[in-house]
From Swiss-Prot:
InterPro entries assigned: FeS_biogenesis (IPR000361), FeS_cluster_insertion (IPR016092), FeS_cluster_insertion_CS (IPR017870), FeS_cluster_insertion_RrpA (IPR023063), HesB-like_dom_sf (IPR035903)
Name the UniProt record assigns to this protein: Iron-sulfur cluster insertion protein ErpA
Annotated source species: Vibrio vulnificus (strain CMCP6)
Cofactor or coenzyme needed: iron-sulfur cluster
GO molecular function per UniProt: 2 iron, 2 sulfur cluster binding; 4 iron, 4 sulfur cluster binding; iron ion binding
Gene name, Swiss-Prot/TrEMBL: erpA
Lineage: Bacteria, Pseudomonadati, Pseudomonadota, Gammaproteobacteria, Vibrionales
Sorted UniProt keywords: Iron, Iron-sulfur, Metal-binding
Presence of keyword Iron: yes
Protein family membership: Belongs to the HesB/IscA family.
GO aspect biological process, one term: iron-sulfur cluster assembly
Length: 113
């Protein structure tokens, strides 16, 4: 399946890390949920959690046998973005490369539109 028409991308690095974390939890029903909440130094912030359920209206994106889930309200702020994973000097983390963000905080955890 091509991701050309998907509103949000799920990178290979993020999918590989999710796959590893799911294996550690020994629960193949887990999916990575990304969501937006109010807060942070720029107005909105990203959240990531593992979830077993997919709610009505949720968008799902699959990569390498794992699923990313986004609720409809959060998706409107994430269209065109990429959920990715990085490991560096500041530690390892999931993050969103979001073209809709007009400003972001220094760590990239919060943004405004």
């Amino acid at each position: 399946m091509s991701d050309i028409n998907l509103p949000l991308s799920f990178s290979d690095a993020a999918a590989a890390r999710v796959k590893m974390l799911i294996a550690e939890e020994e629960n193949p029903a887990l999916k990575l949920r990304v969501y937006i909440t109010g807060g942070g130094c720029s107005g909105f912030q990203y959240g990531f959690t593992f979830d077993e359920s997919v709610n009505e209206g949720d968008t799902t994106i699959e990569n390498s046998g794992v699923t990313l889930v986004v609720d409809p309200m959060s998706l409107q702020y994430l269209i065109g973005g990429v959920v990715d994973y990085t490991e560096g000097l500041e530690g390892s983390r999931f993050f969103v490369n979001n073209p809709n963000a007009t400003t972001t905080c220094g760590c990239g955890a919060s943004f405004s539109v």
